[in-house]
Regions:
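Charged structural interfaces that engage phosphate-rich ligands
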Residues: 1-152
Length: 152
């Protein structure tokens, strides 16, 4: 079976510089120009320069565990690093009431399999709009039925 790195090939942004603030989120963030769904094969180009302090984003989690490659779409209006740290805590604490915590607490999964990237910078500060964009990407990437975005 192919690895997630093969399935979700990305081009790394060469001019990206981590925030240099001893950020605990940056090691988990993949900085890319494109994201590819491991289920549908759809490729999305990233629409704006982004980093861990970017707000109003749709983001994409990939499980890098060989043979798994499941993905999750989420949104945040806060700084991206704040949301990343929450996901990391869910995983490290085995919080199975949260989708990412549940997935990464499965047998042979752990925090080293967690990768996250910004999928889209939403250009308007409208809660209803960002929620709709999140739903569109969940449908587009089939993350509800064949991904980590499952209802508990």
């Amino acid at each position: 079976m192919m690895s997630c790195q093969t399935i979700s090939t990305v081009r790394i942004v060469k001019d990206y510089k981590p925030c240099n603030k001893a950020c605990s989120a940056c090691p988990y963030i993949t900085h890319t120009k494109t994201i590819k769904s491991s289920v549908t094969g759809i490729i999305v180009n990233i629409n704006a320069p982004v980093d861990c302090s970017t707000t109003w984003v749709i983001y994409f989690v990939t499980c890098l565990k060989r043979g798994c490659c499941m993905q999750y779409v989420g949104k945040t209006e806060r700084e991206f690093r704040t949301r990343v740290k929450e996901h990391v805590r869910y995983i490290e604490n085995g919080n199975v009431s949260q989708a990412t915590g549940h997935h990464f607490s499965q047998r042979n999964h752990n925090i080293t399999d967690f990768s996250i990237a910004i999928l889209e910078k939403v250009q308007t500060c409208d809660t209803l709009y960002i929620e709709e964009r999140e739903r569109e990407f969940i449908r587009k990437f089939n993350c509800k039925y064949r991904g980590i975005n499952r209802s508990y």
